[in-house]
Amino acid sequence: MYFTMYMCKFHQLLVAAMAAMSFTCAQAQSTLPSSINEASATAVMQNIMTRTSVRKFKQQPIEDAKIEALLRAGMAAPTSNDMQPWHFVVLKDQKSIEKYAASNKYHAEDIKKTPLFIFVCADTTRMGEGQGKELWVQDCSAVSENILLAAHAMGLGACWTTIYPIQKKVDGISRTLKLPANLIPLNAIIIGYPDEPLEPKNKWDEKKITYGIPE
């Protein structure tokens, strides 16, 4: 109920923002009709605001076309100096998933029930030297958020499960997936068709915002 009220408020703000955008577009003689701009912005914002983490899935395989679409969405993410330091390991066949499950005694049964794993990894050979060599964390995080949003847009559920920077997990996953030394797993995104409806959380908090520079 509270989230519904929150979404109504969000919609009111979006309408106001779109009105301002329509005015700006008109000034700039935009080639796109305002109705297209408004519909597109509404769909994008609705997708962002209604996404939530899903951990329980139907035993239904995900179509290859959707898997490729998820990976394409990930690779469309922003990247420092266009390094594109990402590499993906995809587990979609039951044999591979069961191999992965066998390496994790605490979550083996849940792993077996997950239709798709996308491990987002960093290829350290594509990064620079000095402080810049750690920028892969930001790049691969942007990749991961794109995948989460794309999954939601396609009617799939997904959840980011952390690997890096927990070294024990990094080492264990690297051994299980037989990753070469230049690949570092950031996370495993678990994906499937949701087994139950989940209501997104309202995370809005004005106290976490500072406008301007204090005197």
Residue spans of the language-model regions?
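Acidic, surface-exposed loops and disordered segments
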Residues: 6-8, 25-215
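Bacterial N-terminal signal peptides that target proteins for export
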Residues: 3-14
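Intrinsic structural disorder/low-complexity segments
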Residues: 14-15, 189
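Bacterial N-terminal signal peptides
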Residues: 15-22
